[in-house]
UniProtKB/Swiss-Prot annotation:
Gene that this polypeptide is encoded by: RASAL1
Binding site for Ca(2+) 1: 21, 27, 74, 76
Annotated protein name in UniProt: RasGAP-activating-like protein 1
Boundaries of every PH domain copy: 565-672
Positions of the record's site feature: Arginine finger: 342
């Protein structure tokens, strides 16, 4: 039985932060760390003591993580950033409420002695001889210690305490991965049994030594099960210092989702029930398991369920049938065509998530060039007279302020200058739209046309498609490019306003111009002639989009997009593993990098032919590199294995921590199915005849730090996992099991007289009872399977580890 763990984290906003700049303000941003590893960084909000971020992350994690921390810092253009405060949430605190955490939490002061990380490897023995008892502590090594020196390393030594006695190991200079391999022996002194405490310290020539962490073992543990193995370092026990709100507060939302995923055969009955649902008629179907699942799902859970169901049916090659089933149900119960797909129904959410899962490479290809132009050119555009800054031109030139009419004309020209290429890219993208999306739109077009064939409703079939493609896909991506991975950072206020105007225009085009002049925003009127010109082109585009032959048989199952599709691309600095004769700063060369499901490729620019590529199947590890390795930040390594079994390392430097995390995540996901992954690697580099991390002199020395292949950011490129998706559906059904039982009881007690009075069909009621009973039976079987596997786990845990 596999286990999965993921954190949904939303950094909402801060309030009452202290001023760190001479201007009386701060430039705050937030770092999100899991077990001392940075997994995300928010955008910087300039000149604010009450910043709003609204950034959301899904982090897939190993099951043994311990702590989630938020650090709020003030960005400085010169020197180091100032730390404002932090919030620490233990795993236990997060899981205390199944709904997670959603609250304001006061920031606390960052205590250097509490900022510990890493592990120590020990072997302890209790010996007895003629002179009494003796404790032998074999201090082997430590890994991933906190950097305490300006060089990004430490000078660690261990100090062992037992009773009133203490001994120290030697000090190993300039490493976070020390190897001592020293045995310390302490004689038991008269008195009560004493605990064993091992402390790690960073030796400093000037000033006091810095604390690196400690472990402690009770006398009972020493006697019954002497410690042997790796142990997580902890800070000194102390009460959490409450700042009383003096450092401000942070509003966060955190939810931990942990699941035990059973073997595939356990979910087969549930899968068969769901697959059967999409095979039959849907217009009046209230009896299928899928219809019951939709009925049981509340609005706040609908999006997550829609995502899992779409992935589930994609994995079986039946996503089109699933969407068609929901579409038929939605269309059949819609009386007014103006309200079609306007609610957040399961059908609407499923189509929306389907587009995000299947169409993100397509979206990037269509919109990214123009979105990049908007960010880079930073043109001022405004049509609303109430928001126009007429004095802006006076501040940046000597020509004086523009009149309102001049500002409107200038802004209109700029807007149409961006909208034109956007519309051109969209209407010219028929051949690039994924076949699965085109087939889904074709089905949608046909179902709506069959339901509303009247002449006065001839636009409804177009509006149904454009409502998804334009209003729920293109327009939101233009409005918030970062959420669709089109940009690494949120837009500044001026660019954000420009994007809002463009998104409004694209929405109006998606509505086929039907609402132009009817809303409150009459200041958009100067743009209406251009928008109306685009409407006829969009109609023609939609006709060509749904003019596609074939069915789902031609769409590969268990894949969101072809293996050759580009998952991530951009400029990085690249360095080969081989020693370079040049200085380090010249060894990294600027390269354009593409990542697909098949290869990691490099060239000098996007227009050049690829000059080098690495098969993704050869990747064995993707990890961060310590800053001290090359005296450079944001470096990662890609470790590959050739046909002879030899390992090779490619180093890549990113612009910032967010770009680093995104590339790490993308590479780890792409290489997730690879066999023979490395359990450990070197976070340093082999330079000057030794590893910079652990100081070992052999290039072939075993890695000194654990790899983190399970730590990834959740996004549209997540691989399909049908068993995990089925587990989520099972969990959702569990929440509604009482309702299912009540429904079965009501249907069983309903007599034929009541059936006649209510107009209910006996055959429909019989199918409802059968479907409800089958669902409850499947849930009971899955309950038993989970209990059996948990009993097996408890049995294995009781036996204890078989080795060190």
């Amino acid at each position: 039985m596999a286990k999965s763990s993921s954190l949904n984290v939303r950094v909402v906003e801060g309030r009452a932060l202290p001023a760190k700049d001479v201007s009386g303000s701060s430039d705050p941003y937030c770092l999100v760390k899991v077990d001392d590893e940075v997994v995300a960084r928010t955008a910087t909000v300039w000149r604010s003591l009450g910043p709003f971020w609204g950034e959301e992350y899904t982090v897939h994690l190993p099951l043994d993580f311990h702590q989630l921390a938020f650090y709020v810092l003030d960005e400085d253009t010169v020197g180091h950033d100032d730390i404002i405060g932090k919030i620490s949430l233990s795993r236990e605190a997060i899981t205390a409420d199944p709904r997670g955490i959603d609250s304001w939490i006061n920031l606390s002061r960052v205590d250097p002695d509490a900022e510990v990380q890493g592990e120590i490897c020990l072997s302890v023995q209790m010996l007895e001889d003629g002179q009494g008892r003796c404790l032998r502590c074999h201090v082997l090594q430590a890994r991933d210690l906190a950097p305490r020196d300006i060089s990004g390393t430490s000078d660690p030594f261990a100090r062992v305490f037992w009773g009133s006695q203490s001994l120290e190991t030697s000090t190993i200079k300039k490493t976070r991965f020390p190897h001592w391999d020293e045995v310390l022996e302490l004689r038991e002194m008269p008195g009560a049994p004493s605990p064993l405490r091992v402390e790690l310290w960073d030796w400093d020539m000037v000033g006091k030594n810095d604390f690196l962490g400690m472990v402690e073992f009770s006398p009972k543990t020493l006697q019954q099960k002497p410690p042997k193995g790796w142990f997580r370092l902890l800070p000194f026990p102390r009460a959490e210092e409450d700042s009383g709100g003096n450092l401000g507060a942070l509003r966060v939302k955190v939810r931990l989702i942990e699941d035990r995923v059973l073997p595939s055969q356990c979910y087969q009955p549930l899968m068969e029930l769901l697959m059967e649902s999409v095979q039959g008629p849907a217009e009046e179907d209230t009896a299928s398991p899928l219809a019951l699942l939709e009925e049981l799902t509340l609005g706040d859970c609908r999006q997550d369920l829609a995502t899992k169901l779409v992935k589930l049916f994609l994995g079986r090659g039946l996503a089109g049938r699933f969407l068609d089933y929901l579409t038929r149900r939605e269309v059949a119960r819609t009386m007014d065509p103006n309200t079609l797909f306007r609610s957040n129904s399961l059908a609407s959410k499923s189509m929306e998530q389907f587009m995000k899962l299947v169409g993100m490479p397509y979206l990037h290809e269509v919109l990214k060039p123009v979105i990049s132009r908007v960010f880079e050119e930073k043109k001022y555009m405004e049509l609303d007279p109430c928001k126009m800054d007429l004095g802006r031109t006076r501040r940046i030139s000597f020509k004086g302020a523009l009149s309102e009419e001049q500002m409107r004309e200038t802004s209109l020209g700029l807007l149409t200058g961006y909208l034109g290429p956007i519309v051109d890219a969209i209407v010219g993208s028929v051949g690039r739209c994924p076949p699965a999306m085109r087939l889904a739109f074709k089905q949608l077009h046909r179902r709506v046309e069959e339901r509303f064939p009247q002449a006065e409703h001839q636009d409804v079939k177009y509006l149904a498609i454009s409502g998804f493609l334009f209003l729920r896909f293109f327009a939101p991506a233009i409005l918030t490019p970062k959420l669709f991975d089109l940009r690494d950072q949120h837009a500044d206020p001026q660019t954000s306003r420009s994007l809002l105007l463009l998104a409004k225009a694209v929405q109006s085009i998606g509505n086929l111009g039907q609402q132009l002049g009817q809303g409150k925003e009459l200041w958009m009127a100067p743009l209406h002639p251009f928008l109306l010109q685009c409407v006829s082109r969009v109609r023609d585009f939609l006709d060509r989009l749904v003019d596609v032959d074939g069915d789902e048989a031609g769409v590969p199952a268990r894949a969101l997009f072809p293996p050759s599709a580009i998952v991530r691309e951009g400029y990085l600095l690249k360095r080969k593993e081989e020693p370079a004769g040049l200085a380090t700063r010249f060894a990294f060369k600027k390269r354009y990098v593409w990542l697909s499901g098949e290869t990691l490729s490099f060239s000098k620019s996007p227009e050049w032919q690829m000059c080098h590529s690495i098969p993704v199947s050869h990747i064995r590890a993707v990890e961060r590199v310590d800053e001290g390795a090359f005296q450079l930040p944001h470096v990662m390594q890609v470790v590959t294995q050739d046909g002879t079994g030899a390992l090779h390392t490619t180093y890549l430097q990113c612009k910032n921590v967010n770009e680093l995390n995104q590339w790490l995540s993308a590479l780890r996901k792409a290489s997730a199915p690879n066999p023979n992954k490395l359990a450990a690697c070197h976070p340093g580099a082999f330079r000057s005849a030794r590893w910079t991390c652990c100081l070992q002199a052999e290039r072939s020395a075993a890695g000194c730090s654990r790899t983190h292949s399970a730590v990834t950011l959740g996004d549209w490129s997540d691989p399909l996992d049908p068993d995990a998706e089925a587990q989520t559906v099972y969990r959702q059904l569990l929440l509604g099991r009482d309702q299912l039982r009540l429904k079965l009881l009501e249907d069983s007690n309903m007599d034929t007289t009541l059936e006649a009075d209510t107009g209910a069909c006996p055959e429909v009621l019989a199918r409802q009872r059968a479907a409800t009973a089958r669902l409850l039976e499947v849930l009971a079987d899955l309950d038993r399977a989970h209990e059996e596997f948990q009993q097996q786990e408890r049995g294995k845990a009781a036996l204890g580890p078989l080795g060190p």
